UniProtKB/Swiss-Prot annotation:
Family matches, as InterPro entries: SelO
Residue positions binding Mg(2+): 245, 254
Residues the entry annotates as binding ATP: 81, 83-84, 103, 115-116, 166, 173, 254
Protein role: Nucleotidyltransferase involved in the post-translational modification of proteins. It can catalyze the addition of adenosine monophosphate (AMP) or uridine monophosphate (UMP) to a protein, resulting in modifications known as AMPylation and UMPylation.
Gene Ontology terms, MF aspect: AMPylase activity; ATP binding; magnesium ion binding
Record-given protein name: Protein nucleotidyltransferase YdiU
Keyword list, A-Z: ATP-binding, Magnesium, Manganese, Metal-binding, Nucleotide-binding, Nucleotidyltransferase, Transferase
Residues at the active site: 244
EC number(s) on file: 2.7.7.-, 2.7.7.108
Keyword match Ribosomal protein: no
Classification lineage: Bacteria, Pseudomonadati, Pseudomonadota, Gammaproteobacteria, Alteromonadales
């Protein structure tokens, strides 16, 4: 890897230099060729293993942990920071630079009495979900590798430590801006320095002046809305949408007790610490805006309040438009720009409202009838929209409700000239395979009990091609067995 050190060299006082501690008996549990290509790597090798397990120093690495704060479950915590993630620097790839971080690399000044380690189960889950979301075209950080060890660590019981090698276009979070806004007591120098750095590194088309700051925040609002629209469309629940877990680039990261929906449930909670359902699946769009408002507050020294409010007011529209774009592709609705006759803005808005109503009625039917979200949407790839019968009806208990919806659906889709092509388009928009919690758990158990990572590798391969039939992997598309239904994870890692 070839590193540059822009954050380390230009933002002194925004981090603490700290060196990772090695893990014993390191071994590859998983490796992503796709992620490796992003930073110009090819195959894993023994020397790289020793570098990424902190047994050898990586040439050109600086090793540091960033400081930030954040709102956690709605309450402000004035000092957080990287408690178990140590950044090596920005690795230069063929199409840009990516931060390389060792998640589980050991204690830092921000560990808050923790050991700075990650347990194998959380490292494996982060590796797999990074692969899964990337293949689903959801904006996300990546995981280059997961490295196992025989180093014991204590959580509720003894487990083994592991390291996830995370790649991110940036590790700058909403919480970075909160920290320097609240801790500098009205001195905007460091806040301005951070905004300028963020723009120069990641928004180079913008200027570092009042006009540039205004446009930058608008683009942050837009990218956040787009990310969450993607989450809602694929049934992804993040679980811990604290502001310190929000990327300034609108990429998904900081994976903890996440889950994909099995049975559709608007109020699904995947984090057993979320007693009030603050971060429930259906709450995510609203929390995205709440978090953006916390970010906007920090920017008041450099951006006019009216401009911040104007940008925030675009969030809901952008979220809905992105969600509509994705759901129309899933259900086979023509996009407004595909219409043979141009329609004006008022007609587009009316069509959008009707489409949202149809989508909401469908998800309502899925919830009422306790149906699997992913499998139900995949059925549209076998549907002839001109046929009076839909196989989706066979799963319904509320037949009258479905029939009413289906008639409206057929009217919206209209006549389809080439049914086979239409079905292929639906299959390219609706995945057959997702990372179900029980599948990840089976891979983890195989490693824990037998040191066998074959299930992990099989699952990784499957998730890299979620839209393909992969008929030999059919069992992975089934609804969870009884023991795997509604698994709720903890933040313990």
């Amino acid at each position: 890897m070839q590193f540059k050190q822009d954050f380390f060299e230009q933002l002194e006082g925004f981090y603490s230099q700290v060196y990772p501690l090695p893990i014993s008996n390191p071994h590859w549990l998983g490796w992503s060729d796709d992620a490796a290509q992003l930073i110009g790597l090819e195959k894993p090798n023994a020397e790289l293993l020793m570098q990424l397990s902190a047994n050898y120093a990586a040439p050109g690495a600086s090793y540091y942990a960033q400081v930030y704060s954040g709102h956690q479950f709605g309450g402000y915590t004035p000092r957080l920071g990287d408690g178990r993630s140590i950044i090596l620097g920005e690795a230069i790839g063929p199409n840009g630079a990516w931060d390389v971080a060792l998640k589980g690399g050991g204690p830092t000044p921000y560990s808050r009495q923790g050991d700075g380690r990650a347990v194998m189960r959380s490292a494996v889950r982060e590796f797999l979900v990074s692969e899964a979301l990337a293949a689903l075209n959801v904006p996300t950080s990546r995981a280059l590798a997961v490295i196992g060890s025989d180093l014991p660590v204590w959580r509720e019981s003894q487990e083994t430590a592991a390291i996830t090698v995370r790649l991110a276009k940036s590790h700058i979070r909403f919480g970075h801006f909160e920290y320097f806004f609240h801790s500098e007591q009205g001195d905007a120098a460091k806040l301005t320095q951070l905004v300028n750095f963020t723009i120069q590194q990641h928004f180079p088309h913008l200027s570092t002046d009042a006009a540039g700051y205004k446009q930058w925040f608008y683009e942050v609002v837009q990218s956040t809305a787009k990310m969450i629209a993607h989450w809602q469309s694929v049934g992804f629940a993040h679980g811990v949408m604290n502001t310190d877990n929000m990327s300034i680039l609108g990429d998904t990261f900081d994976f903890g007790p996440f889950a994909f929906l099995d049975t559709f449930k608007e109020g699904f909670i995947c984090n057993h610490s979320d007693h009030e359902g603050r971060y429930a699946f259906g709450q995510q769009p609203g929390i995205g805006l709440w978090n953006l408002k916390r970010l906007a507050q920090t920017l008041t020294p450099i951006i006019e309040s009216d401009d911040l409010i104007a940008a925030l007011n675009t969030y809901q529209f952008e979220l809905v438009q992105q969600y509509l774009l994705l759901m129309r592709a899933k259900l086979g609705f023509s996009q407004p720009n595909q219409s043979p006759n141009a329609i004006n803005a008022e007609e587009q808005a009316d069509l959008g409202n009707k489409d949202l109503q149809l989508v909401g009625q469908l998800t309502g039917l899925l919830e009422t009838n306790q149906l699997d979200y992913t499998n139900s949407l995949r059925r549209f790839g076998q549907l002839d929209p001109s046929s009076a019968h839909s196989s989706l009806r066979d799963d319904m208990v509320d037949l009258a409700g479905f029939d009413t919806w289906y008639q409206a659906y057929q009217s919206r889709v209209g006549e389809v000239a080439d049914v086979n092509a239409w079905q292929c388009e639906r299959n390219s928009a609706n995945p057959k395979y997702i990372l179900r919690n029980y599948l990840a758990q089976e891979a983890i158990i195989a490693i824990e009990e037998n040191g066998d990572n074959s299930k992990l590798l099989q699952l990784q391969q499957l998730l890299q091609r979620p839209f393909d039939e992969q008929s030999e992997m059919e069992d992975f598309a089934k609804r969870p067995p009884q023991w795997g239904q509604g698994l709720i994870m903890s933040c313990s890692s």
